[in-house]
Curated annotation (Swiss-Prot):
Name by which UniProt lists this protein: Protein RecA
Pfam family, one: RecA
Alphabetized UniProt keyword annotations: ATP-binding, Cytoplasm, DNA damage, DNA recombination, DNA repair, DNA-binding, Nucleotide-binding, SOS response
Gene Ontology cellular component terms for the protein in this record: cytoplasm
HAMAP family: RecA (MF_00268)
Gene that this sequence comes from: recA
Presence of keyword Transcription: no
Function: Can catalyze the hydrolysis of ATP in the presence of single-stranded DNA, the ATP-dependent uptake of single-stranded DNA by duplex DNA, and the ATP-dependent hybridization of homologous single-stranded DNAs. It interacts with LexA causing its activation and leading to its autocatalytic cleavage.
InterPro entries (alphabetical): AAA+_ATPase (IPR003593), DNA_recomb/repair_RecA (IPR013765), DNA_recomb/repair_RecA_CS (IPR020584), P-loop_NTPase (IPR027417), RecA-like_C (IPR049261), RecA-like_N (IPR049428), RecA_ATP-bd (IPR020588), RecA_C_sf (IPR023400)
Amino acid sequence: MTQEREKAIELALSQIEKQFGKGAIMRLGADEALPDVAAIPTGSLSLDLALGVGGVPRGRIIEIYGPESSGKTTLALHIAAEAQKMGGIAAFVDAEHALDIGYARKLGVKTDDLLVSQPDTGEQALEIAEMLVRSGAVDVLVIDSVAALVPKAEIEGEMGDSHMGLQARLMSQALRKLTGIISKSNCCVIFINQIRMKIGVMFGNPETTTGGNALKFYASVRLDIRKIASLKQGQDVIGSRTKVKVVKNKVAPPFKEVEFDIYYGEGISREGDILDLAVEKGIVDKSGAWFSYGGDRIGQGRENSRLFLKERPELVNEIEGKVYDVAGIPRKGAKEAA
């Protein structure tokens, strides 16, 4: 590329960033994420690294979508638990009226400190969300789910009435109002969304998310979460192998994919996730079926090695620290909760 063209493109990039903000455009091959982006860990180290900043960014809108029972709420609750560990406040707007408090507690959420709202209408849910964000004291706000944000007119109307585009209009208006105050308050707002099928699509992906197109534009990070296999112990299904694709990312290069295990009643397997990453980065050696770390054997087979690590949290923390060092991402600490 000639010097003049290089100069011209640099000028265009700087103008785009000036007008639309840092991260509006970036080179796909560039490894660097946006500098100094405060983030909250997701509970999965591999996903934290795929997001490029060590977790979901603060002061941004995040969308987590996928089919039913794919782990959307589990991932959102893990993020809420991580925010609480850092000394922050988490809120959960339960529009689906389906939050399982016992399960949230098992994932590490301090349920006594969790702010929970079960609104009657979509308008009420989004107004509550706006007031919580405006307070400036909430670190993570989860809205579960966009599909359950039913407009008041639809609730008060008859069962067969048509309400075309009402929910999309509601979301569009709410996001226009919310996006500015979310940025100022440094709150991470997570919208959980469901998948629908577009009718009559012959070519391309027939899947779409509910609530119109506004959320697709306003979200800084969009995560597509899918169950790809069942985890079995004998004949019993004890969990699922889950794949997450970073479909959109305005704080680091997108399109990265990760896989991790979600166990029923336990959530994301931290030890299994760290073990997979450590093998990938060459921190843990895998020879045949044996896993070894620092010359010592951890176990034979992945499951035995995972259970060995589960009983030794200090060893897990040590390996996790080395993974962060190799990845070149600073470890997220309590200092960021302020």
